[in-house]
């Protein structure tokens, strides 16, 4: 499972000219389920995101998590994070999960994020969405559960 996180002062997502999700300070999380992913990857990614220390403490160091700051999370599905751009000029998306499985894992991810106690807003899976944000920092991070799986396998 892949996620692109942005620390934001504010973010919103609009579908058909209506705002369906909106947060103040916190994280905007674009998420994509990959072929072969399961609920285990969703759980792993949620746990990492909820505890990732990318918010400033009183000394100005990135030492606090979104949970520590009582921040909110806006989760937006984005299958294009699964793009393969290694050859040619047109991205391929065969590594992203099939739409039905992608939707199931997206909803699983959102439910698990809510279980952390954080305030969670969401986009609409598969919809044409307009996302607005004020990036704070800027701080933008890429997470991929496959990276952790490969690292763990090699550290044995």
UniProtKB/Swiss-Prot annotation:
Q: What is the reaction catalyzed?
A: glycyl-tRNA(Ala) + H2O = tRNA(Ala) + glycine + H(+); a D-aminoacyl-tRNA + H2O = a tRNA + a D-alpha-amino acid + H(+)
Name of the molecule in the record: D-aminoacyl-tRNA deacylase
Which InterPro entries did the record assign? Daa-tRNA_deacyls_DTD, DTD-like_sf
- Signal peptide as annotated in the record: none
Per its UniProt record, what PANTHER family does this chain match? D-AMINOACYL-TRNA DEACYLASE 1, D-TYROSYL-TRNA TYR DEACYLASE
Its assembly, as annotated, is: Homodimer.
Keywords in alphabetical order, please. Cytoplasm, Hydrolase, RNA-binding, tRNA-binding
Q: Which GO terms describe its cellular component?
A: cytoplasm
Task: Kindly name one Pfam family recorded for this protein.
Answer: Tyr_Deacylase
This molecule's function is given as: An aminoacyl-tRNA editing enzyme that deacylates mischarged D-aminoacyl-tRNAs. Also deacylates mischarged glycyl-tRNA(Ala), protecting cells against glycine mischarging by AlaRS. Acts via tRNA-based rather than protein-based catalysis; rejects L-amino acids rather than detecting D-amino acids in the active site. By recycling D-aminoacyl-tRNA to D-amino acids and free tRNA molecules, this enzyme counteracts the toxicity associated with the formation of D-aminoacyl-tRNA entities in vivo and helps enforce protein L-homochirality.
Question: A single GO molecular function, which one?
Answer: Ser(Gly)-tRNA(Ala) hydrolase activity
* Coiled-coil segments on the chain, per record: none
In which domain of life is the source organism classified? Bacteria
* Location of the motif Gly-cisPro motif, important for rejection of L-amino acids: 137-138
The subcellular localization recorded is: Cytoplasm
UniProt EC number: 3.1.1.96
Q: Which Gene3D superfamilies match?
A: D-tyrosyl-tRNA(Tyr) deacylase
Which Gene Ontology BP terms does the record give?
D-amino acid catabolic process
> What does its UniProt record remark on the domains?
A Gly-cisPro motif from one monomer fits into the active site of the other monomer to allow specific chiral rejection of L-amino acids.
The family line of this record is: Belongs to the DTD family.
């Amino acid at each position: 499972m892949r996620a692109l996180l942005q620390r934001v002062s504010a973010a919103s997502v609009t579908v058909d000219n209506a705002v369906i999700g909106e947060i103040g300070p916190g994280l905007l999380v674009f998420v994509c389920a990959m072929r072969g992913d399961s609920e285990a990857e969703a759980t792993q990614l949620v746990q990492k995101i909820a505890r990732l220390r990318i918010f400033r403490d009183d000394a100005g160091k990135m030492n606090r998590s979104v949970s520590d700051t009582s921040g909110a999370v806006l989760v937006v599905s984005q299958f294009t994070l699964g793009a393969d751009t290694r050859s040619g000029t047109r991205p391929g998306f065969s590594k992203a999960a099939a739409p039905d499985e992608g939707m199931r894992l997206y909803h699983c991810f959102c439910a698990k994020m809510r279980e952390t106690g954080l305030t969670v807003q969401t986009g609409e899976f598969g919809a044409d969405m307009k996302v607005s944000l004020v990036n704070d920092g800027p701080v933008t991070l890429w997470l991929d559960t496959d990276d952790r799986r490969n690292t763990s396998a090699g550290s044995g």
